[in-house]
């Protein structure tokens, strides 16, 4: 996801450094968990989805540990899940919790409400997926803020 964003920004004349973190540290090749440019200055976190916000919190810790500043978060899909953890669930969303806790903006391309609107739209593009509407609605009723 980050590489495709960097490519498109480059096409717009914006040559920005980028990096990503591996889930597991490797002891060969480049080693470590950060691949790409060193983390310096203000860093935008890019992720495919936000659920509880755990990976965002981990990314913020990695950025700070490297002396950089988390500037914001861009995500493809906000699942609109309640924030908190296994012991304590909040009534606010994980996105709202991240924004409040770290004082950074979180923006998404789409959220679960958008997905449900698409599934219920009756459009030709949605026809293949309408069978999932009930399951997505049940998920939203159970887990979302």
Regions of interest found by a model, annotated:
Residues 2-43, 54-57:
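Short, glycine/charge-rich flexible loops or terminal/linker lids adjacent to PRPP-binding catalytic cores
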Residues 5, 50, 110-112:
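A broadly conserved detector of short glycine/acidic/proline-rich loop/turn motifs that flank catalytic sites
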Residues 21-24, 47, 77, 109-111:
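Fold-independent oxyanion-binding glycine-rich loops
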Residues 25, 29, 34, 47, ...:
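Residue-level signal for the start and early helices of compact helical domains
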Residues 26-30, 52-54, 80-83, 116-117:
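Short, well-ordered, mixed-charge alpha-helical segments that flank or form enzyme active sites
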Residues 37-81:
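A contiguous pocket-lining binding segment that forms or flanks enzyme active sites
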Residues 62-145:
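PRPP-dependent phosphoribosyltransferase catalytic core
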């Amino acid at each position: 996801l980050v590489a495709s964003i960097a490519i498109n920004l480059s096409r717009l004349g914006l040559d920005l450094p980028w990096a990503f973190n591996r889930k597991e540290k490797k002891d060969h090749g480049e080693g470590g968990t950060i691949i790409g440019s060193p983390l310096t200055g203000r860093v935008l976190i890019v992720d495919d989805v936000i659920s509880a916000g755990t990976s965002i919190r981990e990314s913020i810790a990695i950025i700070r540990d490297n002396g950089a500043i988390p500037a914001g978060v861009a995500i493809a899909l906000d699942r609109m899940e309640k924030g908190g953890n296994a012991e304590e669930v909040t009534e606010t969303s994980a996105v709202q919790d991240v924004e409040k806790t770290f004082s950074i903006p979180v923006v998404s391309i789409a959220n679960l409400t958008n997905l449900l609107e698409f599934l219920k739209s009756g459009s030709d593009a949605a026809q293949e997926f309408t069978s999932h509407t009930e399951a997505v609605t049940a998920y939203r009723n159970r887990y979302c803020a």
